[in-house]
Regions:
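Acidic, low-complexity segments
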Residues: 4, 20-132
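Bacterial N-terminal signal peptides
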Residues: 6-15
């Protein structure tokens, strides 16, 4: 009898799936809410850090941080050895949703009018790999 009840509960739970979302399907992220005024939940700054598959920071999005309400986004690119290679300058996004931007370097180049809107980090050719 116990097995029969357990079987029916399992079958019924399959008919009504629960919807749980912790991360997006393509990106891991951490979302931080900083409240700017005590007792006023509408006055807050939302910061979303997106990470790649190895847990390295890939993008930092400040949601609705620009004066016109758009997002401000900065990014990091890594070289073949996993070291920071380029840090993209913070640019205004065309979105205000806090979402991940897949073509951030192209959007930054369009926004600034510069072909290379980043800081490139060089390393010395030694086992110590010190930053130049």
């Amino acid at each position: 009898m116990k097995r029969l009840i357990l079987f029916f509960i399992t079958m019924l739970s399959g008919l009504f799936p629960m919807q749980v979302s912790a991360q997006s399907l393509s990106n891991n992220y951490v979302q931080i809410h900083t409240y700017l005024e005590a007792g006023n939940a509408s006055k807050r700054m939302d910061q979303i850090q997106y990470f790649d598959d190895l847990g390295r920071e890939e993008q930092l999005v400040l949601k609705r941080f620009a004066p016109n309400g758009q997002d401000v986004v900065s990014g990091v690119q890594y070289d073949g050895y996993g070291r920071k290679w380029r840090e993209l300058i913070p640019v205004q996004s065309i979105y205000s949703t806090g979402s991940y931007i897949s073509n951030l370097s192209e959007q930054a180049a369009r926004f600034t009018g510069d072909a290379s809107p980043y800081t490139e980090i060089g390393y010395e050719d030694s086992p110590l790999e010190r930053v130049l």
